[in-house]
Amino acid sequence: MGLKEQFRKPIHKQDLFSVIYQALFMAFTGGILIGAVLLLMIRLLGFELSWLMLFVLAMLTARRIKQATYEKHIIFSIISVLAFILGYYIMNVTAYAGMIFTTTGSVSNIPFDLILNPVYYFYFLYPLSSTFFQVSNILEIVFFVIAIHYAFKYSK
């Protein structure tokens, strides 16, 4: 079935609302929980496994959206990818706000204008940055694209 035919399939309103609800739920709760686990790993173990957290977030988002539908539609997969990207943003906000809080010991010292800026968390995708061709950045991009593909494919 071609891409045009997949978009022409009818969308059931009940499925659409259920998918949007589940996507937002997983983006917020999954992002907060996985961000807290990422913070715990950075603080206690001293290293970061954000690529592993990407797969966990993509898996949880795709599974939750797949269970929320009766009939499959390509819009649901696109919503899954958008929920994954929102969850990735919330995961990073949670982890970095927690790191600043545990370092300074006060909520008033957290620079919310920097913490809530999404450009900071998605800067690794910017091809004109000076760090774009570093090995760690290339690995981050590869795992991010694989996680997006996973969220798209397995939410069908």
What are these language model-derived features?
Residues 57, 62-156:
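Core subunits and conserved enzymes of cellular information-processing
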Residues 2-55:
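Transmembrane alpha-helical insertion/packing segments
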